[in-house]
C-alpha cells in the first residue's frame, strides 16, 4: 500500500512539473506581400523580427531557422 501511495505522489509531481513548463508557445511565420517568409539573422531575439511581428499585430517574435517567428500569431 505504501508503494502505491509513493508511486501516486511521484506521478502527480511529474504531471505538475509538466503543466508548469507547458507546451511550446503557438505561433507562425509571418508572410510578406509576396507570400514569402521574412529572413533574419542572427538567430534568437532579433529586433527586426520583433518589429515585423508588431507590424502583423503580435507583441513578440524572434529569429528561428533564419526566418522570423511570431508567438501567438495565426494566419
UniProtKB/Swiss-Prot annotation:
Gene3D superfamilies: Knottin, scorpion toxin-like. Expressed by the venom gland. Disulfide bonds join 40-63, 49-68, 53-70. Residues 1-22 form the signal peptide. Residues 25-75 form the LCN-type CS-alpha/beta domain. GO terms for molecular function: ion channel inhibitor activity; sodium channel inhibitor activity; toxin activity. It is found in: Secreted. One of its GO terms (cellular component) is extracellular region. Transmembrane segments: none annotated. Keywords: Disulfide bond, Ion channel impairing toxin, Neurotoxin, Secreted, Signal, Toxin. SUPFAM superfamilies: Scorpion toxin-like (SSF57095). Probable neurotoxin that inhibits ion channels. Belongs to the long (3 C-C) scorpion toxin superfamily. This is Toxin-like peptide AaF1CA7.
Amino acid at each position: 500500500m505504501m508503494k502505491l501511495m509513493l508511486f501516486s505522489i511521484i506521478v502527480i509531481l511529474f504531471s505538475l512539473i509538466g503543466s508548469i513548463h507547458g507546451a511550446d508557445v503557438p505561433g507562425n511565420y509571418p508572410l510578406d506581400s509576396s507570400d514569402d517568409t521574412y529572413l533574419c539573422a542572427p538567430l534568437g531575439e532579433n529586433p527586426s523580427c520583433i518589429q515585423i511581428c508588431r507590424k502583423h499585430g503580435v507583441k513578440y517574435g524572434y529569429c528561428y531557422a533564419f526566418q522570423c517567428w511570431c508567438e501567438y500569431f495565426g494566419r
